[in-house]
Structures are given as C-alpha cells and as structure tokens.
Amino acid sequence: MTTLHFSGFPRVGAFRELKFAQEKYWRKEISEQELLAVAKDLREKNWKHQAAANADYVAVGDFTFYDHILDLQVATGAIPARFGFDSQNLSLEQFFQLARGNKDQFAIEMTKWFDTNYHYLVPEFHADTEFKANAKHYVQQLQEAQALGLKAKPTVVGPLTFLWVGKEKGAVEFDRLSLLPKLLPVYVEILTALVEAGAEWIQIDEPALTVDLPKEWVEAYKDVYATLSKVSAKILLGTYFGSVAEHAALLKALPVDGLHIDLVRAPEQPDAFADYDKVLSVGVIDGRNIWRANLNKVLETVEPLQAKLGERLWISSSCSLLHTPFDLSVEEKLKANKPDLYSWLAFTLQKTQELRVLKAALNEGRDSVAEELAASQAAADSRANSSEIHRADVAKRLADLPANADQRKSPFVNRIKAQQAWLNLPLLPTTNIGSFPQTTEIRQARAAFKKGELSAADYEAAMKKEIALVVEEQEKLDLDVLVHGEAERNDMVEYFGELLSGFAFTQYGWVQSYGSRCVKPPIIFGDVSRPEAMTVAWSTYAQSLTKRPMKGMLTGPVTILQWSFVRNDIPRATVCKQIALALNDEVLDLEKAGIKVIQIDEPAIREGLPLKRADWDAYLNWAGESFRLSSAGCEDSTQIHTHMCYSEFNDILPAIAAMDADVITIETSRSDMELLTAFGKFKYPNDIGPGVYDIHSPRVPTEAEVEHLLRKAIEVVPVERLWVNPDCGLKTRGWKETLEQLQVMMNVTRKLRAELAK
C-alpha cells in the first residue's frame, strides 16, 4: 500500500487568525494564554485536515509563532548571544524580541528561503558558538497530535541546511561547516527526545542539496547521517525546490530509511533513483503554486513507480504547503465572477484532497475515484482550450517582435546628452524613489471606494489632494526630479495586476511572508495585455502642478512575475515578455503625454535567480530582455530609471548593466556604501543613485552620517553620474520624519555641490 504523508502546512489559518492574534498580543490586547490557545486550535485544525485526506502521517514541528528556522535556533541553543537570553528557558516575549528586535538589540536579519517568497531569520554563527539541545517545541507538537489519536511525523530542518542558511559573524574568520562536530550531538539529543516521545518516523529536511554545494559540504552528509541514523527512529531525508539527481550515488548510500524528492520542480528525477532500495517519497502535488493538478497525468508518472517500489512508495506535496493559500472554497467572488478559473485552482485544502484521490487510485484502483479523476481531467481540458487564457493577438505580437525589439534607439552616451539638454540638472541631482507616506486617510478613502461607500469622483479628488501635497512638499525641499507619491496604489504589483488582462485576485488567498506579515499574490492565469492607460492620468495631473520633471512610476515585468502566482502552462520567460510589452504600451503613452522621466522598478530581479548557477545566464538573459522591452522605442531624450533594493549585486553586475537603464537607484545606506564599491570596480557605465539614508527606520539621520555616505559614493562613482536619493520608497514612514529626513539629504547635497563648484 502506498503511504500518504505531509511535510508542512500553512500556519496562519484560513482567515489569518494567527496574524491577528499575534498582533493583538504585541499590542497587549490579549494575554499569552489567549495567543497560545489560538495557536493550539490552528494546529489541531491543520492535523484534522490532513487526517481527513487519509494521511498516514500528519506533519508536526512545522507550526511556529514566527519562523521554523528561528525555532531551530532555539532548539539548538544557537540564538544570538548579543540578546543575553537563555535558550533553555526562553519566554514567548523573548522569542518575539529575537525576531523583531528590542530597545537594546536589532532583530535577527531576514532573507528569502531558497527561491521562495517566504523569509526566514538568518542564524548568526560565531567561531565560538556553542549549541545546547531543547526539543520542547517538537515534542510538544508530537504529543498534541498523538493525543488526538493521530500518527505524526516530526519535521526538522537538517544540520547541514541549518548551517548553510546561516551567516558567519564576529571578528574571527572561520568556516561555519567547522561547527558541525559541536552541532551534531545536539541534533542526536533532539531526535532521541522525539523517539522517547513516540516518533516512529522523523523527516529531516535538507533542501541545501538542491543548490551548488561545495564539495566538502556534500562530503559531510556521509558523516552526519551515519551519526543521525544511530537514533532508533526511521529517518526520511527530505529534499525539495530542485533536483538532487547529481547526488544520487551519495543519497542511495546514506544510512537513512527513506528519501523525499520533488517531482514538480524536477520531474526527471525518478530515473536517477530507479534502483533505490528504501522508501522513496515523491512530491507530485505542487506545494508552491495554486493550480489544480491533472491527476490522470500524475498517475501516469506514479503508477510505474508503484509497480517497481510497492509499499516503499510514499506520496506527498513537492514541499511544505506553507507557500500556498489555505482554502479555495471561501473564494465566493472568484467562483461567481470567474467560474472557469475557480475550477482550475487548488489551494492547500484542495491539494490535500488531490493527494487523497491519488492514494485511493494507487491502492484501490482508478475506478474507486473515477468521478474525481473525471473532474480533474475536465478542468485540465477546459484550461487547455480556454479563449480567456490563450489570445491570438498577444501571441502574434510576441512572435512578430523583430530581433532588436528590446534596444533603445541610441547608446547611453548619446541618450544622456539628449536628456541633459532639456533636464538641465545640477551636479548631484536629487530625487525620491517613488512612494510617499500612505496615511490612514489614504487607506480609509481607498477602502471606502472599494466598498462603494465613496464615489469615483470623490475618490479621485481625495487622491489628487494627496498628490498635490506631495508635489508641494518636494518643491519646498527643492528636489530636482519629483514623484507623485503613489497615493492611489494599494501595492506595487496588485495595482498593475488589477489593470492588466490575464490577472485575477482572491479575497483570502494569503500566504505568510514572514512572522505576522502575509501577502496576497495576484494570479496570472492568461495572456497579458493592457486594455487602457494605467498611470497616465495620475502622472500628468502631478506634472501639471510643477515645472520640474515628474517621474512616471511603473513596476517592472520581472517583479510583477516574481510576486505573483504564475500560470504553469507556458514558460515563465514568455509570461514575463507579455507583461513587458503591456508595460511598454504604458511607457510610450506616458512619453506621449509629456512624462519624459519614467522609472521601472525591479526590486525582484535577483530573487528570480535559479538555485543552480548553471541556470543563471538563461534567466538573466530573458529577465534583462523583458526589462529592455518595457522601455524600448522611447526617444533618446526620455530618461529611464530603475530601482533595486537588495544587497548582493557583485555576481550579477554585467546583467544589471545590460538592462541599460539610464539611471539605477539602489539600497546602500545600511551597508555603508560597500555595495557601491562593486559598481565602481565594475565601472558601471550609466548614472547611479545610491541610497544615502535608511528608510526602514523612523530615525532621522544626522547630516554628518549622510555626508559620510555621499562622500564615500563620490570616491567610487564619477560625480557627474551620481544621483542623491533615499534607499527606498517612503510608503511606510510618517510625514514628520519623512520631511525631516529629506531636509537632511538636501542640506548635505547643497553643501557638497557648493564645495564641488569651487
């Protein structure tokens, strides 16, 4: 009989119950006991949903109040010593301080979990880091599930992945792999505690096996699993997010009891494990996207495996279902307005039922679930033939693109002359990244408009009032190139998705980004085009209020792609180019309307990098082409800006230069301009605006701090190509600190301009 198991479930609840309880607790509106009760209820519901799918093992240990890697830092005693906390007796209050900071210590750094949109808290490892076991978190969840009469499988991220996703800190140089001999006995203690609590199987996840691991890290797997296998539980080694076929010989030799492989991201993997003689768990339902599976097709893959493996075949989702929204059945608006699209989707609860059907088909024959298989096939056929998805005009436009369709008319050296001729900017021109504070009044007006409580005319008047205020304040500050402040935008991707064809939105399709923060990604279900202008009216209104240049503001094609649930029936590169052409229509309309400085934001370019470096070039080529397509056809005198906010550029600088934006603004203040050194060494050819203060904090920088950063920038970038701007958009700031921060930036700029003029 084939076994069905789960690796992880969304933590936040169907209606973000955990988020609201956490935030109430932080505001001291509920007690710790009340928060714990909400969490316990959510865990029980999650397990019951898994049990309702006929799961042989429910997942435990995956639920967390903030992040599973933070839980692991606590469980191994690896919390940062700078907090002065005792990991053995950590209070919930202290746990949250690790994640959110306190008056004495900044929060643990966050970054994206592999190539997902989930953020984990990065372990801080020092040469002298000591580890200490505390298995309470995992044991408690195991016992709770057992008390409900369920068979449970604890899931723990493995020691090598734990070390891999951490960072080396401190003055002493060392390799974090050298901590393994100290860490391994602690893992043995944690696993032993789980065995004593009744765990039969334990899943140890090692997604690091899907990235380019150095040889010594790969070799370390032998010793690690030789040690861990001495614990008397059965070990299922979990891999996901990519192929581990290159490590097949190693994985077959490891003394574990089973292996989980991701057949959604890497469907070719069964060939590499055809002779595997232990449990082989195959992830056949997509844990990262929202499309219903064609179950007949899945069975065509899995039935031959069952014939070969018999009882050694296990099935599951490709990875934890953490990355998918909770329940499609509550999406009543989507069902009413787009019934076909609704029938093509599967959220977490629907995916559990897909796995139930697959298990029944494998164990009792396809006839036992003939009705469900027929419904799955009907949905797949409907999607394949839908005119809502496949549009001949969009396909023709892409097919007819000439070879150099993504190129500007002239090289940068010619364009910059044409731009300066009319812009006539001073040395060190100043600008903002885009957004200004989204006040309560703005949010209330938008909410009222969406509910039909505010007319379109009144909403437009309210937004125009905000735009006028933003323009007036920038003029008072004497900024050179202005922005309209984006008052009308709820979110930099959702705003455009609502105005482009091929996009749809959910009411409750929330997924956890980090901690209590959830995002509701748009769904790109069909060919993308732009029915009408999206930003022209707002930008031209803003331009009418000032003689200074006004920036048009667009979100770039790669970022829209990265922050959405993307259709899986055509290549992502094709979807991205469709978005780029839709944006190009907007760029040319802005230009026609007199907006001659246009920013196309691409904060997510780096996030899209494949896990394996061998795949980088292909991605960077189509990502760069998409960006260039979005601005192609502009006059030389139109200045194209882009903005990027992340800290690792060095390895992709040639690709960023190839995007050929006239001006790039980047987030650099928190790294003390270190990032800029890479641009200097690379001799980045176009204009550049490094952020001179950190907008993520309400703190107003001193003039000395901003001057220090700007002087560092002048050392690296030719002053005639240097812009001055904040790190990022100002959406999350209050007005008071925004104006004070910008005033400091302007004072320093004026001082250095005077100095440079001498």
Curated annotation (Swiss-Prot):
Organism taxonomic ancestry: Bacteria, Pseudomonadati, Pseudomonadota, Betaproteobacteria, Neisseriales
The protein's name: 5-methyltetrahydropteroyltriglutamate--homocysteine methyltransferase
Pathway, per record: Amino-acid biosynthesis; L-methionine biosynthesis via de novo pathway; L-methionine from L-homocysteine (MetE route): step 1/1
Details of cofactor binding: Binds 1 zinc ion per subunit.
Enzyme Commission number(s): 2.1.1.14
Transmembrane regions listed in the UniProt entry: none
Function statement: Catalyzes the transfer of a methyl group from 5-methyltetrahydrofolate to homocysteine resulting in methionine formation.
Gene Ontology biological process: methionine biosynthetic process; methylation
Active-site residues from the entry: H696
Family in the record: Belongs to the vitamin-B12 independent methionine synthase family.
Gene Ontology MF annotations: 5-methyltetrahydropteroyltriglutamate-homocysteine S-methyltransferase activity; zinc ion binding
Residues binding 5-methyltetrahydropteroyltri-L-glutamate, per UniProt: R16, E17, L18, K19, K112, R517, C518, W563, E607
